Amino acid sequence: MERIASLSRITKETDIAITLNLDGSGKGDISTGIGFFDHMLNGFSRHGLFDLTCQVKGDLEVDCHHTIEDTGIVLGQVIREAVGDKKGIARYGTCILPMDEALVLCSLDLSGRPYYVSDVEFSTEKVGKMDTQMVKEFFYAISYSAGMNLHFKMLSGSNSHHMIEGMFKAFAKALDMATTYDPRITDVLSTKGSL
């Protein structure tokens, strides 16, 4: 069964088209108009071994908020659709990932119950053209539109670029772990019988 999903979403602020293959090889085709954000999404694709096409046109003349938040909303919806009924998958994923001086923990549960928790604070307002406060908005949007419980903890770090890159890569590894099939799981991994 292919775990591929595509979604297009057009508003007055953004025009977004995303395709995600959970069982890919890490190929990214990303264009959001925000260079650092493109770099992070390419890292997510590569380190999660997801094939990701993400074409975004946003009102960057205003700022980067709508572009980044709306991309998170659509990516979360695509993740949810690609995961499907969740039968046979691990459901949980955790990664502690180093990125130079930064050490980030990401843990998630594809429970269907959205929740976002993070203790991450940045010392700079921007990395390239991306506002660092948008990192929270992006992952919050993913957690709610995908229906996942998502936690980040920054165990060490001082360079905002390294910290953000560590978050995107750790999220990719944790999501890859959570969506991995386990032959011992014959149904949905829940005492309720559904997620």
What are these regions (language model features)?
Residues 1-195:
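N-terminal intrinsically disordered, cationic/polar leader segments
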